[in-house]
A protein has these predicted regions:
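Non-catalytic accessory regions of SAM-dependent methyltransferases
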Residues: 1-146
């Protein structure tokens, strides 16, 4: 298996999500993490970083969009680092979050348990419950720039 090349474009299908909400594609046996990707999408992916056991990439063109892709309603989505699932329909967001827990229990915990379906919010908007406060080397504290 040849290593993937930084800057080169490969065609792949997104087959799942990482624990951080990145799409996961497999190209010639290599795992590629792709932000703003949706499970089931067939896309051209440019390799942006080659690491020891995986690669990072970005979508160049979507050949077959997922029916679970939606246009984010937030103008900062994809730039501020706070809404990893904003481009997903709410049912797909819940499936992705359920998969995250299932993967942690099975692959990391070694447990043979089945995670129940997530009971979603009645109103899937305006329920943000996470905030990141990065601390700089100089001691400054603040939000990521959008």
């Amino acid at each position: 298996m040849e290593p993937l090349e930084k800057g080169k474009i490969y065609r792949a299908v997104i087959d799942g999500y990482s624990s951080e909400g990145l799409g996961i594609a497999r190209v010639d046996g290599a795992v590629v993490f792709v932000p703003h990707a949706v499970r089931g999408e067939d896309a051209d992916i440019r390799i942006t970083k080659v690491m020891k056991t995986s690669c990072a990439g970005e979508i160049v063109k979507i050949h077959t969009p997922s029916p679970d892709r939606m246009e984010p309603d937030c103008p900062y989505a994809g730039r501020c680092g706070g809404c990893a699932y904003r481009h997903l329909t709410y049912p797909e967001e819940l499936r992705a979050k359920r998969q995250r827990v299932q993967d942690a229990l099975t692959r990391i915990g070694g447990l043979d348990l089945q995670v129940e379906k997530i009971l979603g919010a009645k109103n899937p908007e305006h329920y943000r419950n996470k905030s990141q406060y990065p601390v700089g080397a100089d001691g400054s504290i603040g939000f990521f720039q959008a």
